């Protein structure tokens, strides 16, 4: 008891240092949060470690200091409940600190050695799960002495509060020693690997400027809303600073807490007794490491924030004005065809669609009634890359009824000219099992074989909505149909304004794969009248004034349109040989001054419109 009476002399120092550590760690957490726009795994682990230090000096160390000061009075002594609370909280926070430092070093090694795998493996979620596991294991093991896992012959709370592991019990002491020793060893190994890899990369970057870098990838939906993002490679200076900070934290912890706790625990278990110097060593080391962590955070320029930034962060937190960060990293590989810089703004109206003929396109699927046209632009390493997630991909869990899951756009009831674009996308889309069933183009797979005319140039004649096939009565009595709920095949016709003699969508060497079909023979047809363009359909006498009745059948136009369909239109040279130089250039006019897009003009393709 005389040795324990020397402990109250250090209680005042513990309280003062504990108060300073509490304020410093709180400032460190605010500084890290103010310097970062969103929470990242490494910053999250640093803040968790600082919060663990705050709890350690606020609960067990403060409790022990106050009790030691109160013990100077003869009428006060430790009781069983207070001693159990102190032992459980102290060892819980000691183990949590040890595991947090090891997790910090492991995440840094993972990020430095395997940067792509680290960014694609949802490291943020793994860091959260790691912290939850750390606290669960630490609490379960440290709470066992309070419920009976201790030496029953002489309990640790009978004479004062002897919290060294040898006084608690042999089983608890061995488990605690193994956990702390293994965690310290793993932290040292991970830190050494991360430091070596960082220095090697720095030397390699100086020797080779073409070092591999991970691009910053931002995931957005079809409406442009940011869903998630993947951070790119760190700059050389930032990477070196962060690795140096983690190395310093691990080194200081091992020197001030890891190895001293191992030495004290092993010595007490070997001697089966505890000494006053053991309690003094463990408590002072805990306070010292809690004081040094904010100093290291302030020394790193990446996490050093001024008073103004911290004040703005606090005001944003109190006003709940901070944007909600629901972004999560991708949980797997990224399909290369989804990596886009941005989606193309497409125009819609009447019988034309605006296209940029200087870009290469692919018509992915009908989402919301119109094909989405994406420019395939070359990836740039110094810019963010964007992933476009279509609505049906996001609602893939409810693809039984895609019309109920995806809100229909306002222009969908006007299915007349919109279906022309649908059939156009059907012609150039590749057929096969890779087509998504949730897409609106799935109606083409359910059609009878008589409608599957993708290999013939006359399939361009199937551009007519089903509402016109049923006559004026059916068009008035029934709402406009959708591609998935359209009735079976029937005689259909199309406007001649969409039929050029040569289908020049873009530069032919950049055409989609569906347009690269081998040339096939076409049936002979009467020649075009004199004075008319070979690729232009002859205008019937009644075409100047449209009749309100239904359009004529497709067979009535086939004969007049076949002369303009060249048998060699699948070859690059066939674009000029089919209808001369006028038809190809008139199909895509020059870009306008306002938008810069080329426009499909119906008056240059025929006179039926």
UniProtKB/Swiss-Prot annotation:
Write out the ranges of the annotated region (Disordered): 446-496, 514-609
Name the membrane topology term. Multi-pass membrane protein
Specify the superkingdom. Eukaryota
Q: Where is the composition biased (Gly residues)?
A: 571-583
- Spell out which residues lie on the membrane's Cytoplasmic side: 33-41, 106-126, 197-243, 298-609
Q: Which GO terms describe its cellular component?
A: plasma membrane
What one GO molecular function would you report for this record?
G protein-coupled receptor activity
Low complexity compositional bias, start-end? 458-479, 527-536, 584-596
Keywords assigned by UniProt?
Answer: Cell membrane, G-protein coupled receptor, Membrane, Receptor, Transducer, Transmembrane, Transmembrane helix
* Transmembrane regions listed in the UniProt entry: 12-32, 42-62, 85-105, 127-147, 176-196, 244-264, 277-297
Identify the SUPFAM superfamilies for this entry.
Family A G protein-coupled receptor-like
Which compartments does it reside in? Cell membrane
Family assignment from sequence similarity: Belongs to the G-protein coupled receptor 1 family.
Protein task: Orphan receptor.
- In Swiss-Prot or TrEMBL terms, this protein is called Probable G-protein coupled receptor 153
Please report the organism this UniProt entry assigns to the protein: Homo sapiens
């Amino acid at each position: 008891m005389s040795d324990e009476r020397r402990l109250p002399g250090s209680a005042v120092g513990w309280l003062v240092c504990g108060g300073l550590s509490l304020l410093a760690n709180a400032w460190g957490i605010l500084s890290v949060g103010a310097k970062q726009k969103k929470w990242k795994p490494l910053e999250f682990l640093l803040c968790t470690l600082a919060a663990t230090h705050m709890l350690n000096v606020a609960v067990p160390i403060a409790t022990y200091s106050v009790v030691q000061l109160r013990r100077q009075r003869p009428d006060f002594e430790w009781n069983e409940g207070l001693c159990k609370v102190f032992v459980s909280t102290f060892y819980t926070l000691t183990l949590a600190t040890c595991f947090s430092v090891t997790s910090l070093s492991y995440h840094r090694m993972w990020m430095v050695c395997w940067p792509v795998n680290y960014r694609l493996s949802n490291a943020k979620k793994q860091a959260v799960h790691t912290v939850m596991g750390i606290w669960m294991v630490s609490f379960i093991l440290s709470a066992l002495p309070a419920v009976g896992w201790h030496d029953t012959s002489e309990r640790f709370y009978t004479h004062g509060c002897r919290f060294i592991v040898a006084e608690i019990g042999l089983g608890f002491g061995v488990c605690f020693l193994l956990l702390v020793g293994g965690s310290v060893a793993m932290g040292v190994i991970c830190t050494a690997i991360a430091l070596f890899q960082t220095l090697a990369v720095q030397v390699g970057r100086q020797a080779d400027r073409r070092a591999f870098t991970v691009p910053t990838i931002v995931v957005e939906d079809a409406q442009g809303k940011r869903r998630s993002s993947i951070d790119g490679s760190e700059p050389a200076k930032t990477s070196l600073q962060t690795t140096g900070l983690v190395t310093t934290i691990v080194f200081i912890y091992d020197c001030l807490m890891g190895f001293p706790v191992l030495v004290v625990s092993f010595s007490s278990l070997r001697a089966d007794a505890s000494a006053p110097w053991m309690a003094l060593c463990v408590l002072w080391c805990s306070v010292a490491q809690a004081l040094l962590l904010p100093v290291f955070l302030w020394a790193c320029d990446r996490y050093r924030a001024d008073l103004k930034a911290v004040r703005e962060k606090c005001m944003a937190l109190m006003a709940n004005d901070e944007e909600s960060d629901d972004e999560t990293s991708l949980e797997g590989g990224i399909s290369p065809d989804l990596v886009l810089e941005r989606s193309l703004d497409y125009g819609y109206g009447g019988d034309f669609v605006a296209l940029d003929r200087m870009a290469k396109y692919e018509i992915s699927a009908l989402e919301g009634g119109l094909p989405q046209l994406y420019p395939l632009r070359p990836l740039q390493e110094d810019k963010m890359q964007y992933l476009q997630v279509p609505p049906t991909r996001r609602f893939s869990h409810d693809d039984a009824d895609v019309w109920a899951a995806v809100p229909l756009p306002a222009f969908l009831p006007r299915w007349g000219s919109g279906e022309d674009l649908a059939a156009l996308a059907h012609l150039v889309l590749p057929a096969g099992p890779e087509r998504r069933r949730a897409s609106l183009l799935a109606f083409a797979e359910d059609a009878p074989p008589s409608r599957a005319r993708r290999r013939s140039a006359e399939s361009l004649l199937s551009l007519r909505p089903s509402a016109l096939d049923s006559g004026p009565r059916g068009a008035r009595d029934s709402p406009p149909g959708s591609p998935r709920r359209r009735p079976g095949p029937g005689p259909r016709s199309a406007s001649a304004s969409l039929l050029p003699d040569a289908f020049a969508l873009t530069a032919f060497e950049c055409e989609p794969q569906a347009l690269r079909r081998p040339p096939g023979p076409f049936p002979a047809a009467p020649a075009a009248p004199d004075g008319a363009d070979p690729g232009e359909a002859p205008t019937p006498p009644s075409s100047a004034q449209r009749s309100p009745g239904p359009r004529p059948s497709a067979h009535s136009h086939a004969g007049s349109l076949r002369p303009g369909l060249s048998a060699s239109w699948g070859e690059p040279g066939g674009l000029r040989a089919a209808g001369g130089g006028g038809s190809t250039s008139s199909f895509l006019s020059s870009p306008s001054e306002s938008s810069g897009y080329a426009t499909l003009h119906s008056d240059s393709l025929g006179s039926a419109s």
